[in-house]
Amino acid sequence: MNQITPTYRWARRAQDTVAPAVTATAHGNAIQLGGGYGFPDTLPDIVAEAVAAAEAKAETLQYGPLYGLDDLRDTIVAYLAQDGIVAARENILVVNGAKHGLDLACRVFLEPGDAVIVAAPTYLTAVHILKDAEASFLSIPQDEEGMDTALLRRRLEERRDNGGPMPKLLFDVPDFHNPTGITMSAARRRDLVALAEEFDFVIVEDDPYRRIRFEGEP
């Protein structure tokens, strides 16, 4: 039997040592600060949910709609409206978490070698996904207001003036940033939107923590 040598992309994934380390500390009495683990008492009653699901097995044990359950998509539309985002059910695609969503965004918007704007530092798992997409990085430092948008503008202008490759995508966690904990100011958010319109790149926002706060408005 011939020995099969893994492709270089698979070989790079196989060297990932982050998942075992996180998994090893995700249980027991340890408080895991390296991932978005919820407080156990706030988790849903999975036994009650399982009983309800069994009673509705004709619906729950079949394939669901391709873009997600209609009721869920409508709920997401209403949730977005709280932040002034106008959307319709047809604009919503339900995915299996942020990692799945970011991977899909990379497949849609990026070609190997394309530049992606990220904060320095940025979410470690996002780095792995972007590397798998063979993206290059334009890393922008942060201060207490989040990503330095003035510096980002200068970097973008330099690339444009020198005929360099322009970024196609920006990834950030603007609320309680992982790993810094910084929340981006409203002024910086407006700056980012203006830059995206001027320099024609897509903003991918990872926003799991926006409404989990002890003080202030989201």
Give the residues covered by each predicted segment.
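N-terminal small-domain helix-loop-helix segment of the aminotransferase-like
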Residues: 10-97, 104
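Glycine-centered flexible beta-alpha turn that most often forms the glycine-rich phosphate-binding loop
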Residues: 206
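Conserved PLP-binding active-site segment in aminotransferase class I/II-type PLP enzymes
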Residues: 2-12
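Intrinsic-disorder/low-complexity coil detector
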Residues: 5, 19, 43, 164-166
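Conserved core of the PLP fold type I
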Residues: 59-199, 210-218
